[in-house]
Structure formats: structure tokens, C-alpha cells
């Protein structure tokens, strides 16, 4: 915190004025008195300034609007994204590395244009229904500002159009009473933070901490321009070798590559999160939080919550198609590893930016309530066997934009305290 040092006119200043007055005689006595009075006034003003400065460093209020330590405490307030004006990102190297080849012609044809209008309208309706159900469950819902993402912008290093304000999980992470803006890694997402600034400024004024991670330049050096991608097998080999489209030129990360369990936060090195970004988070959150790197057998690592989703104290969903290499860490801590069933989303349903495993991308309202897709009956039954009641909402069309319930939300406030689940 920047402090302002207060300068006060002390006893030496008064002695100096008295000396001057006695030497110059009565002709300047009035001047001396006025000067002394001015000094006293300045001192009082300085003290008032200090009081204002002290006020700026007061402790956070007990009713801070931002407070969340994990993924399962009772949910009180959440940000839900918007599908309005969502645009297909330009087909750049980082987009190519994060999408499947069957969709590449779609990006090449429509990059910079809006997603199909009919599909967007259906997605908007689904998310509105999701918001209504959350409100009925007693959750306060906040929404980002609507923005025209088709506008072209240019920096000294690149030019692009935008993507959307649909997935607050990708750009925001709440750790305790602090809300952190992720720097992101796609050029199409460079200005995505603008959609959330109205909300974040409100939280800040009401007592929350607000941190913006270092913004990358997204210059060519951040990306391996010759990243070889031709097949899923290529991706498996590259990921196994620790090779990703993002380099270590500068820190970058998406918030959705992190998942919280009290004092322990887990993160993967992915196509959008590099080691410099992870190290920035590790240093920023130390010593209160411990950041652990985990990895998976995943040909396209991007965002952890459709691969490894912590849903309760000692309870985690682990994608059977992408096994965790560090799963013994959780087993030794006594955690229960749950394997979700294969998703049943049809093969012909468009998933331009994700896989079918969005079925496990669920939002916990508390330890015993989960928001799950109404079409995914197998995973509903799995939760019921775990003693968790399901709140069913259909967001199939919203899935096409790259996210499930966890992605479409950022939990701002959960009723709970900071605890350790690994000590």
C-alpha cells in the first residue's frame, strides 16, 4: 500500500520563527505571527490528510461481497456470463492448437463474424433460464456488460476481433476476499475483462480486493508459430513432451486452469497457461495458499474443470479419458475419486470449442446440491448415488460456445471459511 508521509511543523519551526521575530523587531512581528499561524494551519491540514490516508488502509468490512475459498461451500452470489454478440475468433495459431481439426473450416470461414444467430438465440434463452433457477435457489446473480465483440482492435503487436463475455470462469478467480483478473492467452480475448469491470468496481468499492495479473503483450514470441498439429496423436505426443503452443516469453494464464480446495489450489500447464503464469500466481498467493501443478493424459489441455472437478471436501470427479498423473496425492490424503459416466451428448451436436465432457463441468450450490445438464441422465444418477440432489437445467446450445455450468459462472461469494483439506 502506498503511504503518504506527513510533514508537521514541530517545535524547531516555532523556535525559528520566534528568533526571526526578535531579531527583526516589531516591524515584522505581524508577519511572523501570520507565518506561524499559516504553519499551524498547514500542520492541521497535513494531519487531516493522514487521517484520510489511514482510512484508505482500514481492514476489509466483515460483510465483504467477495468471499470464496473452494468449489462447494453454500453459494450466495455468482456471476453468470452472456452469449449475446459472441463472435467466432480469428483462426490464429493459438486457436488452432485448442480446437479440433473437424472444426477448422468453420473458423476459417466465420472467424471475426458472429456465431450462428439461431444458435446464439437458443443459448441466450438457456442461460436466462439458468439464471432464473439460480435465483429461485436463493443465489444472487450478476451479469457482465453486453459488448459488441465483432469490433476490430489493434495493439502494437497484433490485431484481432473479440470472442465473448460468456465464460467468467476463464477470466476471473476468487481467492478469499480477492478477485483476480487473469491475463488470458488468446488474442481474441485480450479485452474480455471490459465486460466485467462494472461488477468488479462495485465489489472493490464495497470492500473486496481487486488484482489484475500482468497483461501479456501477446506478441508473436508468446506463441510457437510452427507448432505442429495434424492429428490427436500429434497432440498426445506434444503434450507428453511438455510442448504447448504458448511459450514462456511472458506470463499468461486462464483462471479456468485453476481449481480451489481451501489452502490448496491445483493448476495445469496447458495451451493457455504457462509456467510463468503459474509462478506469478504461486508468488502472489503465498504464503496463505499453496499452488500445486497437476497434469493429465490430455491431447488438448485447456481448462481443468472438464478434466478434474473438485465437488466437495475430499471428493473429486476425475475424467476417465484424461487420467491424472498425480492422483496418488489425493488418494494418500484420503480423498474419494469418482469416475463420471460417459456423456451422452449426440455426435452431431456442434461443440466448436470443447468436448462432450462438459457433462462433468457442473456447479455445486453446496455439498448436497449440484446444477447439472437436464439431458445427462447418467451423471444425474451418479450424483444421486453420492447423496447429492440434482438441479436440472438444459444448456446444450450454450455448451457449443465452450462451457458447462462451471465455465459459465464465477462464484463470487460462498458461505465458508479458509481450511486445509490436505494437512
UniProtKB/Swiss-Prot annotation:
The record's principal subcellular location, in a coarse class, is: mitochondrion
Q: Where is the transit peptide?
A: 1-43
Query: What residues form the catalytic site here?
Result: 254, 303, 407
What is known about its subunit structure?
Homodimer.
Q: What is this protein called?
A: Glycine amidinotransferase, mitochondrial
Q: What's the EC number here?
A: 2.1.4.1
Q: Pathway listed for it? A: Amine and polyamine biosynthesis; creatine biosynthesis; creatine from L-arginine and glycine: step 1/2
Q: Does the keyword Acetylation apply?
A: yes
Q: Which UniProt keywords apply?
A: Acetylation, Membrane, Mitochondrion, Mitochondrion inner membrane, Phosphoprotein, Transferase, Transit peptide
InterPro entries the UniProt entry points to: AmidinoTrfase
Question: In its keyword annotation, does this UniProt entry include Mitochondrion?
Answer: yes
Q: Which residues carry this modification: N6-acetyllysine?
A: 385
Q: Which residues bind arginine?
A: 170, 305, 322, 354-355
Q: Which Gene3D superfamilies match?
A: L-arginine/glycine Amidinotransferase, Chain A
Entries under PANTHER family matching the protein: GLYCINE AMIDINOTRANSFERASE, MITOCHONDRIAL
Amino acid at each position: 500500500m502506498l503511504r503518504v508521509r506527513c510533514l508537521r511543523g514541530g517545535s524547531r519551526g516555532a523556535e525559528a520563527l520566534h528568533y526571526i521575530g526578535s531579531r527583526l523587531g516589531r516591524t515584522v512581528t505581524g508577519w511572523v505571527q501570520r507565518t506561524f499561524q499559516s504553519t499551524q494551519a498547514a500542520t492541521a491540514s497535513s494531519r487531516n490528510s493522514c487521517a484520510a490516508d489511514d482510512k484508505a488502509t482500514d481492514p476489509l468490512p466483515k460483510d465483504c461481497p467477495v468471499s470464496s475459498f473452494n468449489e462447494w461451500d453454500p453459494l450466495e452470489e455468482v456471476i453468470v456470463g452472456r452469449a449475446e454478440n459472441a463472435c467466432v475468433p480469428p483462426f490464429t495459431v493459438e486457436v488452432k492448437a485448442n480446437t479440433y481439426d473437424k472444426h477448422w473450416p468453420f473458423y476459417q470461414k466465420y472467424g471475426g463474424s458472429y456465431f450462428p444467430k439461431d444458435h446464439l438465440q437458443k443459448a441466450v434463452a438457456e442461460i436466462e433460464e439458468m439464471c432464473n433457477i439460480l435465483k429461485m435457489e436463493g443465489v444472487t446473480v450478476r451479469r457482465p456488460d453486453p459488448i459488441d465483440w465483432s469490433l476490430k482492435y489493434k495493439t502494437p503487436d497484433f490485431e484481432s476481433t473479440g470472442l465473448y463475455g460468456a465464460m467468467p470462469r476463464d477470466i476471473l478467480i476468487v481467492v478469499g476476499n480477492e478477485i483476480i483478473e487473469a491475463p488470458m492467452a488468446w488474442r481474441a480475448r485480450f479485452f474480455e475483462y471490459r465486460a466485467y469491470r462494472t461488477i468488479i468496481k462495485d465489489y472493490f468499492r464495497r470492500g473486496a480486493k481487486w488484482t489484475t495479473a500482468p497483461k501479456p503483450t501477446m506478441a508473436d514470441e508468446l506463441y510457437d508459430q510452427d507448432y505442429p498439429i495434424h492429428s490427436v496423436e500429434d497432440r498426445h505426443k506434444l503434450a507428453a513432451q511438455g510442448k504447448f503452443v504458448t511459450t514462456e516469453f511472458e506470463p499468461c494464464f486462464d483462471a479456468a486452469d485453476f481449481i480451489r480446495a481451501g489452502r490448496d489450489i491445483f493448476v495445469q500447464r496447458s495451451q493457455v497457461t504457462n509456467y510463468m503464469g503459474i509462478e506469478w500466481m504461486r508468488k502472489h498467493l503465498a504464503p496463505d495458499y499453496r499452488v500445486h501443478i497437476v497434469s493429465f493424459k490430455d491431447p488438448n489441455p485447456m481448462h481443468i474443470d472438464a478434466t478434474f472437478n473438485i465437488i466437495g471436501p475430499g471428493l473429486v470427479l476425475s475424467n476417465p479419458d484424461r487420467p491424472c498423473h498425480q492422483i496418488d496425492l489425493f488418494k494418500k490424503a484420503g480423498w474419494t475419486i469418482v469416475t463420471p459416466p460417459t456423456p451422452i451428448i449426440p455426435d452431431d451436436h456442434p461443440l466448436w470449442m470443447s468436448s462432450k465432457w462438459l457433462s462433468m463441468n457442473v456447479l455445486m450450490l453446496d455439498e448436497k446440491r449440484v446444477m447439472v445438464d437436464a439431458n445427462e441422465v447418467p451423471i444425474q444418477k451418479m450424483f444421486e448415488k453420492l447423496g447429492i440432489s440434482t438441479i436440472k437445467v438444459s444448456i446444450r446450445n450454450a455448451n457449443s460456445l465452450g462451457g458447462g455450468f462451471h465455465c459459465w459462472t464465477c462464484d463470487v461469494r460462498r458461505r465458508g471459511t479458509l481450511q486445509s483439506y490436505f494437512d
